[in-house]
C-alpha cells in the first residue's frame, strides 16, 4: 500500500454537524476502498490566499492514510461530486525518505493530540510605562 496525504478545504458556511458529516464521508470512501487512515487533522477555519468559488475563508482538514493506488481515482471522483469541498490536494509519498517523513508526521500529530492541556498561567501585573529619554540638544553659535 502507498502512503498518501489528502488536504481539503470545506465551505465556511457549513455547521459543525455538516463538517463532521463531510469528513466522515471522505474517511468512509477511503476505508471502503481498502485504505487505512493513520490520522485526521483539523487545521481550523482560515483565510484563503485568493477567492475560491466566492469564498474568502475555508475550513482546512488533512488526512494521512495508506491505500492501494486504485483508491485515488475513486476518492478524486467522490470529492469532485461533493459541492461542499471547494478545493483538495492529494500528495503521494514514494521513496523511503518521504515515507519516513510521513510516519514522523503521523507520530508527531498523535503525540500533540494526546498531550494534556496546560493549566492557565496566572495573570501578570501590568508593566510600568517606560520613561522616554529626552536628549539635551546643544546649539553652537556660528
From Swiss-Prot:
It comes from the Bacteria. Keywords: Ribonucleoprotein, Ribosomal protein, RNA-binding, rRNA-binding. Disulfide bonds: none annotated. Belongs to the bacterial ribosomal protein bS6 family. It comes from Campylobacter curvus (strain 525.92). Coiled coil: none annotated. Gene3D superfamilies: 3.30.70.60. GO terms for molecular function: small ribosomal subunit rRNA binding; structural constituent of ribosome. Binds together with bS18 to 16S ribosomal RNA. SUPFAM superfamilies: Ribosomal protein S6. InterPro entries: Ribosomal_bS6, Ribosomal_bS6_sf, Ribosomal_S6_plastid/chlpt, Transl_elong_EF1B/ribsomal_bS6. This is Small ribosomal subunit protein bS6. GO terms for biological process: translation. GO terms for cellular component: cytosolic small ribosomal subunit. Pfam families: Ribosomal_S6. Transmembrane segments: none annotated. Residues 113-142 are annotated as: Disordered. Residues 113-136 have a biased composition (Basic and acidic residues).
Amino acid at each position: 500500500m502507498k502512503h498518501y496525504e489528502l488536504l481539503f478545504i470545506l465551505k465556511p458556511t457549513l455547521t459543525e454537524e455538516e463538517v463532521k458529516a463531510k469528513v466522515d464521508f471522505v474517511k468512509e470512501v477511503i476505508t471502503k476502498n481498502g485504505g487505512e487512515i493513520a490520522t485526521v487533522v483539523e487545521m481550523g477555519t482560515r483565510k484563503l490566499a485568493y477567492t475560491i468559488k466566492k469564498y474568502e475563508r475555508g475550513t482546512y482538514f488533512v488526512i494521512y492514510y495508506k491505500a492501494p493506488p486504485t483508491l485515488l481515482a475513486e476518492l478524486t471522483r467522490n470529492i469532485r461530486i461533493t459541492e461542499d469541498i471547494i478545493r483538495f490536494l492529494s500528495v503521494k509519498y514514494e521513496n523511503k525518505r518521504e515515507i519516513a517523513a510521513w510516519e514522523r508526521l503521523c507520530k508527531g500529530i498523535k503525540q500533540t493530540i494526546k498531550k494534556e492541556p496546560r493549566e492557565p498561567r496566572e495573570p501578570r501585573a501590568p508593566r510600568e510605562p517606560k520613561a522616554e529619554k529626552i536628549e539635551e540638544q546643544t546649539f553652537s553659535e556660528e
